[in-house]
Amino acid sequence: MSPNTGESNAAVYASSTQLARALYGGDLVSWIKHTHPGISLELQLDVPVKLIKPGMSQTRPVTVVRAPMGSGKTTALLEWLQHALKADISVLVVSCRRSFTQTLIQRFNDAGLSGFVTYLTSETYIMGFKRLIVQLESLHRVSSEAIDSYDVLILDEVMSVIGQLYSPTMRRLSAVDSLLYRLLNRCSQIIAMDATVNSQFIDLISGLRGDENIHTIVCTYAGVGFSGRTCTILRDMGIDTLVRVIKRSPEHEDVRTIHQLRGTFFDELALRLQCGHNICIFSSTLSFSELVAQFCAIFTDSILILNSTRPLCNVNEWKHFRVLVYTTVVTVGLSFDMAHFHSMFAYIKPMSYGPDMVSVYQSLGRVRLLLLNEVLMYVDGSRTRCGPLFSPMLLNFTIANKFQWFPTHTQITNKLCCAFRQRCANAFTRSNTHLFSRFKYKHLFERCSLWSLADSINILQTLLASNQILVVLDGMGPITDVSPVQFCAFIHDLRHSANAVASCMRSLRQDNDSCLTDFGPSGFMADNITAFMEKYLMESINTEEQIKVFKALACPIEQPRLVNTAILGACIRIPEALEAFDVFQKIYTHYASGWFPVLDKTGEFSIATITTAPNLTTHWELFRRCAYIAKTLKWNPSTEGCVTQVLDTDINTLFNQHGDSLAQLIFEVMRCNVTDAKIILNRPVWRTTGFLDGCHNQCFRPIPTKHEYNIALFRLIWEQLFGARVTKSTQTFPGSTRVKNLKKKDLETLLDSINVDRSACRTYRQLYNLLMSQRHSFSQQRYKITAPAWARHVYFQAHQMHLAPHAEAMLQLALSELSPGSWPRINGAVNFESL
């Protein structure tokens, strides 16, 4: 049950050992027996999924199946449909992915299930087909008459379908949410299946249809391809091996010498490639997929790369390659069932804008058979965070089964789970939805846990264990035999390893980027580039700087940051946006819509779609506070070399005032769960959370002050929203100019800022000596806010209008569409609409 829908399962949401297992249905059998005994429960142990044939006495209107990957769920569905589909039966299949839709229609056709149409092939926008497969985002295209008349609703991968409600591509959230809820409430026959069906979903269906109308199948069969598989999480990436092979340094020209090294990700990969093995490699990031493919190319040219920059190919073609490298573009709906690959390697990098662990888990299961039944995994924790803002919430359930976590660990993490639960209850309260608001806890949990290395590994291990995959910690053995202290030591080693190789990885990625000296896009792309520049940038930007901007935008996280910077500047220029939601909404939709031209490392242009957030009220509240902070600190990212210096006391004052509200707002907007200062700023919590998340040096450092906590919160928000780096200033005086380069006017300005009489000083030397005698007046700690290089070209402040007439004119044109009543009325202004 969702934390905001009742208390029958409330204890689970306060248990750091039970939480992950419950969210992915590990406790479903006991929960149904205890909470909904009226539901028909069928256990299918160690046999593939089998659905009750239509018309049999045990049949109920709603069938829910929880079964691991590879358990035959879709095969059982096809058999059921072959018996159920009479000429007059209508069926709606709701899919979570475009690729899944294509796979389903192919399997339906192969099984002789005729009459199905997909939304991809429909020639009409509004669809009323009798048998339709539609992706959730396009559900609003199904006619109202058809929605109310379907006999059968099929939700294969139902938890992924619900998860799509939170996707950035979900443009019509309220309409789609309402339609799916209507289908669940009214459709006469429902089949819902997933590997992670949980109590939240059962509770929803029970409330809509009644326990007596639900049959739940819990299957434990995982298939030989999974149940015999071992996943070893390696301690070290082996960055030295990667560098040696890619750069081919003279002392290691012969890569065959690498076979003598063992234990790291790249050492083991090289060894298997040298032995002639076929290898599939999963990468959670685009950049690593290209890097590891470059490494493999030293050993073989038979490589297939599947990522967002390369075309997909038919899964049957995979058998023609020795090495398959893929990202999360290969997910549910695509399965490779041949015994071709010997081993799987997996590189997983938890980060706020990357795939969550459920998406990773689903992608790991696409190759059904491995000849050696081994997965070698490296988890790169370089983008995860520790205190004072972030704390792990989870304690590993598998370890808790054999060993006892220390009571202090349990008490503190349970308290953190309760705080997270309360923050979820306060999130999206203005959302006029049924399903989106009900399942928000699971979504927020999956996204927020990406900030924690320990939580990410605990979730992934929970999911792998549900598929009977044994997880082994490198150098320690199966996780079932690992003690809490050993587990935390392993997390520490992983974090240390990732931090040690982070700079080297950045260098390798930069080496792979091509240095473009010329670009001349034409036609459609040239028009898009012109439109983008006129909308966002100042006219003074030259061609070389344009290239840098477009290359920066190839990184997905920089795209929303540029949009946010433009929106913040507009809110400062047009203060009415901070008073009237309609004005802000128009500004937001002006900048957060359309396309970005991006320039990849090969020098090719492509288009990236800008996504609009559904919860604009929350965005408005966040930008109101950010605009106030930016104005108070006089932050302008497009001046003075993108660097602004501010006093730490000014930051502290602002965040004492706005910190609590900002923490809730970034939770909703950034999916970032900042630990409350009242919880983290005490010694037991500070030491325990550092120990659990592998930050052992935190255990011996002093507890941060509230002042330091506020600085860290400011640094986080400005970095994540606008791409700015906040660092301590080491300069003697404010400003970006070094002391020896100060001009006479600069000296006068600095002296005036501390109200020192300089009337007796006429020469530069006199002013300089006077300033140096007053240097103690500038001893207060300052921070530098360094905006990204592209920010200097974004139209931000009104005094730059002469440099950006197009940007200002386009925004004013958009604002002219607002009615007079949308603008705030202040100081007794007349409401002309009422006259």
Swiss-Prot record:
SUPFAM superfamilies: P-loop containing nucleoside triphosphate hydrolases (SSF52540)
Coiled coil segments of this chain: none
GO cellular component, as recorded: host cell nucleus
Listed Gene3D superfamilies: P-loop containing nucleotide triphosphate hydrolases
This protein's record includes keyword Transferase: no
Localisation: Host nucleus
Name of one Pfam family that matches: Herpes_ori_bp
Annotated InterPro entries: AAA+_ATPase (IPR003593), Helicase_ATP-bd (IPR014001), P-loop_NTPase (IPR027417), Replication_origin-bd (IPR003450)
Keyword field contains DNA-binding: yes
Molecular-function annotations in GO: ATP binding; ATP hydrolysis activity; DNA binding; DNA replication origin binding
Binding, ATP: A67, P68, M69, G70, S71, G72, K73, T74
Keywords: ATP-binding, DNA replication, DNA-binding, Host nucleus, Nucleotide-binding
Domain Helicase ATP-binding: 54-215
Any one biological process term the GO annotation gives: bidirectional double-stranded viral DNA replication
Family indicated by similarity: Belongs to the herpesviridae OriBP family.
Protein's job: Functions as a docking protein to recruit essential components of the viral replication machinery to viral DNA origins. In the presence of the major DNA-binding protein, opens dsDNA leading to a conformational change in the origin that facilitates DNA unwinding and subsequent replication.
Record note on quaternary structure: Homodimer. Interacts with the major DNA-binding protein. Interacts with the helicase/primase component 52 and the polymerase accessory protein.
Name under which the protein is recorded: Replication origin-binding protein
Organism this protein belongs to: Varicella-zoster virus (strain Dumas)
Phylogenetic classification of the source organism: Viruses, Duplodnaviria, Heunggongvirae, Peploviricota, Herviviricetes
